[in-house]
Structures are given as structure tokens and as C-alpha cells.
């Protein structure tokens, strides 16, 4: 639990600086979007950016004419721009050896075949060379950090995961609300929802709480958790916004959580009740104990 609290304080605290630093951080760089100006209002600063996982996105070209045609020709992760014989820009696989040398362990990533790469650049460059192959199709970035032993998730542990996750989502929103003044961390509609949670005297403060207390608090203060669960769904449902979460859309939340919470993968797998590889809002909310009558698409704001 202490890891969750540390994760919350450090990353939610990053929200104060994040709106102006996104484009400079490789780990949060968008694959297909040109220069970013900051976190969208109401975005979750805790999850890594969706662009890190958009492996199938198309390259884009700006209409601005440049002396170097490659200057405004943007390639997805793992590819770089080169000019062909007719001076036309094209995206080709990047040589992994051309990736910047990693600064530290925090830049390393682990693939779903349990191989550690020096950075996301090295991973995507390698994946690009496998395009069109069965191995390349199955290869994905699993989580941030070097590969480590992930213990099996026991049934008893699986039941505890949503207790901590719900409490964490609530605390992330409250922290954003408290630090929102002048920072546009939340939209006005989101502020109105979170204000009620923040001002409720019965709210359980962030802390290293036993799961028994978290379970009792959810039962006593159930209404406080309805919006945070919907809010997080909306943060992930972005490409496209269709009311379903794909593996790629879940990745920005899964990747930083797996090293700390070994039940992360199994939890999200159990949420997919119909095994269609997508998690609908109803499945997501149900996984967190939200009653069917309280699941409301209008709360995904």
C-alpha cells in the first residue's frame, strides 16, 4: 500500500509541472501527434500517455513547407524519416543502435515476452523490424521498468486489488482538486463532482489503510467512489472514444502499475466478462463494485 501512496503523491504532484513538460519527455511522447502544448484539462497525470502505446498509428505530414521535407513528416515510434531518391519523405524502421543511451534504470521497459529493453525507443525500433511477422504482431510493451519476477496473483489478492484501486482513484481526484487553482487540472464539470467528495467530512483520508477499512469505507461511503471510477474510464477511452477499452487503451494505466501491483493484469482480464478483448463501461464499473443502476455514461466527463 505504501507504494500506492508514494506513486500517488509523486505522480499527482507532477501535475503541477506536467502541463508544460509533456513534449520534452520521451516516455510520454505522442507517436502521431505533432508538438504538444500540455496535458488536456481533466487528464490523469498518473497514467503514462496513450501515444506511448499506439503502435499502429499512421504517420502524419504537416502542410507547412520546410527546407527539409522530413522536418514536418512525423513517424510513429520505432520509425524515422528518410528521403527517397525523389526527395520524398518516408518513414523507415529506426536502427536500435541510434537510440539515445539510457540515463538510468527508470528508462528501461519490459516487453510481454519478458525481455528488458534499454528504453522505449529501443523497444519500438526492434518491434518495427519485426513488422509483418507473427512475432512482431504479438510483441507489446508490457510495463515500465526492467523485467522482474511478477508473482502469480492469488484469488484472495485479486479481491483486494479493486479496494486499493478505488481508494487510489478517489485520492488522485481529490489531490488534483486541491492543487487545481490556476493549473486547469480539472474541467469545471469535474470540479463540481470532486468538490462534493472533497468537502464530505466522512471521506477517508489518504493513508496506508488495511483492506478491511477500505472495504468498510466503500460500503459506508459508496457514493464517493462512483464518479472516480467513471472518470478513470474516460481518461483511458480515447483512441477512439467509443465506450470500450482496448488493450492499447488500458496500457497507459497498466504499465506503471504492474511492477507495484502484481494482480494488475489478472484484474483487467477478469473485467472482460464476455472475453471479446474489450472492456465496456458496464464491465469496468462492475469490476470496481459499482452497482448497475449507478453506471451512467454521462459521468464519463
Swiss-Prot record:
SUPFAM superfamilies: EF-hand, EGF/Laminin, Kazal-type serine protease inhibitors. Pfam families: FOLN (PF09289), Kazal_1 (PF00050), SPARC_Ca_bdg (PF10591). It is found in: Secreted, Extracellular space, Extracellular matrix, Basement membrane. Disulfide bonds join 70-81, 75-91, 93-128, 99-121, 110-147, 153-263, 271-287. Residues 87-149 form the Kazal-like domain. Coiled coil: none annotated. One of its GO terms (cellular component) is cytoplasm. Keywords: Basement membrane, Calcium, Copper, Disulfide bond, Extracellular matrix, Glycoprotein, Metal-binding, Secreted, Signal. One of its GO terms (molecular function) is extracellular matrix binding. Residues 1-17 form the signal peptide. Ca(2+) binds at residues 272, 274, 276, 278, 283. It comes from the Eukaryota. One of its GO terms (biological process) is inner ear development. The keyword Signal applies. Glycans are attached at residue 114. Residues 259-294 form the EF-hand domain. Belongs to the SPARC family. Appears to regulate cell growth through interactions with the extracellular matrix and cytokines. Binds calcium and copper, several types of collagen, albumin, thrombospondin, PDGF and cell membranes. There are two calcium binding sites; an acidic domain that binds 5 to 8 Ca(2+) with a low affinity and an EF-hand loop that binds a Ca(2+) ion with a high affinity. This is SPARC. It comes from Rattus norvegicus (Rat). The gene is Sparc.
Amino acid at each position: 500500500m505504501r507504494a500506492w501512496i508514494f506513486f500517488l503523491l509523486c505522480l499527482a504532484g507532477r501535475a503541477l509541472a506536467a502541463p508544460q513538460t509533456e513534449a520534452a519527455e520521451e516516455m510520454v511522447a505522442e507517436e502521431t501527434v505533432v508538438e504538444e502544448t500540455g496535458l488536456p484539462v481533466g487528464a490523469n497525470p498518473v497514467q503514462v500517455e496513450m501515444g506511448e502505446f499506439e503502435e499502429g498509428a499512421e504517420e502524419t505530414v504537416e502542410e507547412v513547407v520546410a527546407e527539409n521535407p522530413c522536418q514536418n513528416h512525423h513517424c510513429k515510434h520505432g520509425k524515422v524519416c528518410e528521403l527517397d531518391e525523389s526527395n520524398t519523405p518516408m518513414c523507415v524502421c529506426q536502427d536500435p543502435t541510434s537510440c539515445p543511451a539510457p540515463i538510468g534504470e527508470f528508462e528501461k521497459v519490459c516487453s510481454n515476452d519478458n525481455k528488458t529493453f534499454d528504453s522505449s525507443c529501443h523497444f519500438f525500433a526492434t518491434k518495427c523490424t519485426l513488422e509483418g511477422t507473427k512475432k512482431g504482431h504479438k510483441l507489446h510493451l508490457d510495463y515500465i521498468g526492467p523485467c522482474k519476477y511478477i508473482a502469480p496473483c492469488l484469488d484472495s489478492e485479486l479481491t483486494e486489488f479493486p479496494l486499493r484501486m478505488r481508494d487510489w482513484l478517489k485520492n488522485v481526484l481529490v489531490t488534483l482538486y486541491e492543487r487545481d487553482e490556476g493549473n486547469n487540472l480539472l474541467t469545471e464539470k469535474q470540479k463540481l463532482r470532486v468538490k462534493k467528495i472533497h468537502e464530505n467530512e466522512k471521506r477517508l483520508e489518504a493513508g496506508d489503510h488495511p483492506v478491511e477499512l477500505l472495504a468498510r469505507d466503500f460500503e459506508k461511503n459508496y457514493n464517493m467512489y462512483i464518479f472516480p471510477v467513471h472518470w478513470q474510464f474516460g481518461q483511458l477511452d480515447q483512441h477512439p472514444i467509443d465506450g470500450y477499452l482496448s488493450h492499447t487503451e488500458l496500457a497507459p494505466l497498466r504499465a506503471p502499475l504492474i511492477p507495484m501491483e502484481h494482480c494488475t493484469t489478472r484484474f483487467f482480464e477478469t473485467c472482460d466478462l464476455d472475453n471479446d478483448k474489450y472492456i465496456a463501461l458496464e464491465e469496468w464499473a462492475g469490476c470496481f463494485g459499482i452497482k448497475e443502476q449507478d453506471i451512467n455514461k454521462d459521468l464519463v466527463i
